């Protein structure tokens, strides 16, 4: 268990004030920054996992207590760490993302909480491009077979021509707020894909993403995809 001195979870405060919280991922560990609404002065807690590359930290909005952290560790490689007390204590998850084939997870880049009606569900995106799901609050992870073992995956992911794992990754995972089975993912060296059946099947949705070299709907290279909060 990795223990840290950290501020307790935010408490209810008067409506006229608010607390700003930033979860910051760096090559030297993770940090949590706090400030008021003026943001002139900041408190900082961390680093968490000093000496590890932290790719992503995210607070679960469904309980406002749980934080998941994707890190590249020197001893165990790509791992996910979990805190259920807002960063005061961290533990590695029991079963991190792992491919069922000879392909190996090089990095874990993205962590996304599931739909609000599924408080136990999380998603993770990796390099090389892989999509994983947890149904036990992030403790154990399994492949989303409809994507990872899709017969068209090589066609989707190898149009850019790079072999660098630094670039080949799933960096964006979105769940429709009104439909937990509606998923959108964004990939570097791949593009944007949509599933309407919980990840069992996927359709490219790259029309409108401009490129000079590719004429079909595959092989785009977005670096981030986000949902509009009012019109997902």
Question: Where is each model-derived feature located?
Answer:
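Extracellular glycan-interacting surfaces
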Residues: 1-232
């Amino acid at each position: 268990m990795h223990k840290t001195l950290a501020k307790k979870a935010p408490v209810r405060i008067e409506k006229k004030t608010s607390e700003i919280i930033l979860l910051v991922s760096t090559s030297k560990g993770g940090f949590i920054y706090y400030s008021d609404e003026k943001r002139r002065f900041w408190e900082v807690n961390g680093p968490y996992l000093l000496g590890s590359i932290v790719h992503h930290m995210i607070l679960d909005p469904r309980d406002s207590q749980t934080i998941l952290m994707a890190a590249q560790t020197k001893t165990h490689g790509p791992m996910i760490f979990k805190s259920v007390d807002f960063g005061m204590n961290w533990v590695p998850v029991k079963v991190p993302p792992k491919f069922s084939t000879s392909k190996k997870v090089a990095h874990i880049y993205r962590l996304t909480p599931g739909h609000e009606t599924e408080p136990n569900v999380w998603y993770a995106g990796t390099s090389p491009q892989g999509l994983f799901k947890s149904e036990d609050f992030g403790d154990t992870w399994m492949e989303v077979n409809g994507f990872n073992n899709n017969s068209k995956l090589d066609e989707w992911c190898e149009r850019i021509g790079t072999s660098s794992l630094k670039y080949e990754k799933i960096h964006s995972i979105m769940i429709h707020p009104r439909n937990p089975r509606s998923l959108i993912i964004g990939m570097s060296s791949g593009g944007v894909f949509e599933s309407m059946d919980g990840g069992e099947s996927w359709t490219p949705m790259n029309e409108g993403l401009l490129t000079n070299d590719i004429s079909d709907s595959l092989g785009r290279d977005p670096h981030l995809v986000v949902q509009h909060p009012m019109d997902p």
